[in-house]
Regions:
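Metallo-beta-lactamase
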Residues: 6, 94-138
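Conserved beta-strand hairpin/beta-sheet module of binuclear metal-dependent hydrolase folds
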Residues: 2-57
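Structured loop/turn residues at secondary-structure junctions
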Residues: 44, 73, 135-137
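Short catalytic-loop micro-motif centered on adjacent basic/acidic residues
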Residues: 39-42, 67-70, 131-132
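Short, compositionally biased leader-like segments
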Residues: 1-6, 89-93
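Active-site metal-binding motif and surrounding structural segment of the metallo-beta-lactamase
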Residues: 48-94
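Short coil/turn segments at beta-strand junctions that form active-site/ligand-binding loops
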Residues: 37, 63-64, 128
Length: 138
C-alpha cells in the first residue's frame, strides 16, 4: 500500500498508523493541501517519523511547506511534529492555546513559529482561507 495518494490534484493524503497492543494498528491520515502556501494538516503518530517525512518529501520539498496545522494535541495527530519541523524550517505551527499547552509538556514547540487560532477564526494561506471549528468532543 502506498504511503501517499491524492484525493484531488491539490490535496494529498499521507498514511501512518499507531500500534494498538492486542489489536494491531490504528490507521491515521494526514493531509497536504498544495497551493501558494502549502499546508500540512496533522503530523502523524510519531511512530515511524522517518517514513512519514519521506512520504511528505515525495509530495513536496519540506522547505516549501508554510503551515503545519495540528488539529488537536492527541499523539496520533501531533506525534511527528518535531520531525516535520526539523525538515520544514519555514513552516509555522498552527494551534489553539490549549493544544499549545498540552504539546509543550511532550514536545519542543518553537514559540516564535506558532500561530494561535481559535474556533470560528480563519487563516489566510494564500489561495484559500482555512476555518477552524471545535468538534463536539473536544
Amino acid at each position: 500500500m502506498d504511503a501517499t495518494f491524492r484525493i484531488r490534484p491539490d490535496v494529498a493524503v499521507i498514511r501512518s498508523s499507531e500500534p494498538v497492543p492486542g489489536v494491531g494498528f490504528l490507521p491515521v491520515r494526514s493531509f497536504l493541501l498544495l497551493g501558494s502556501e502549502p499546508v500540512l494538516l496533522d503530523t502523524g503518530t510519531g511512530h515511524g517519523s522517518d517514513a512519514f517525512v519521506a512520504a511528505l518529501e515525495s509530495l513536496i520539498d519540506p522547505h516549501d511547506l508554510r503551515w503545519i496545522v495540528v488539529s488537536h494535541a492527541d499523539g496520533d495527530h501531533s506525534g511527528g511534529l518535531e520531525a516535520v519541523l526539523r525538515r520544514a524550517p519555514k513552516a509555522r505551527v498552527v494551534l489553539n492555546q490549549v493544544s499549545t499547552g498540552k504539546l509543550s509538556s511532550t514536545h519542543t514547540i518553537p514559540m516564535p513559529r506558532v500561530t494561535w487560532v481559535n474556533a470560528g477564526e480563519g487563516l489566510d494561506v494564500g489561495d484559500r482561507v482555512l476555518r477552524f471549528f471545535r468538534p463536539p468532543m473536544y
